[in-house]
Amino acid sequence: ATGTTFRKNVATSNYGGGIYSAGGSIVLVDSRMEENKAAGGGAIILAGGGTASVTDTAFAANTATNGGAFFIDKNGVLTTASGGVGTDAGTLFDGNSATTNGGAVYVQNGTVDLGSGTRLQGNQAAKGGAIYALGGKDASAKLTFAGTVFGKNSGTYGGAVYSSASVGGTVNAAASDVVFEGNTATSG
């Protein structure tokens, strides 16, 4: 979808307020997902190998119990990129919130690859103000940040990023040219 807005959609007792993708492929370019709400993935859920390729798109004020904007599970993959130049280029996660984990993104047993120009700012959750990563039993979560900015995100634990692994699970992370600025955690 190019130039598309998903606004104020609600999944009352389930996942993916805006989009539910189980094994499908989503492409978002120059779009907006704002004020969507769900139990998991206020804007989007990726499960069963579902993928999302996101370029120059804004996720703002989405809310969920887990994953204010994205809930990623069962080999789901989120990739962001910048297709333009200037201050508005890149993908923006702004003011998303989760009552429990992952203000912007919750990933368990999946992959998050945030490319150059991706900004996560003002997101909030109890654990992982911007991102919560969980390596579930005998599975893994993979995080890659390249040219990513984390600013003014907040949480009780992990103002920007919180990761945890269950027995037999792993969380793998790689980062280059990343800026963490003004993120806060009240308990560590």
Task: Give a label for each model feature.
Residues 15, 40, 66, 101, ...:
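Beta-rich catalytic cores
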Residues 1-10, 19-37, 45-63, 71-97, ...:
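Surface-exposed loop/turn motifs in large extracellular/passenger domains
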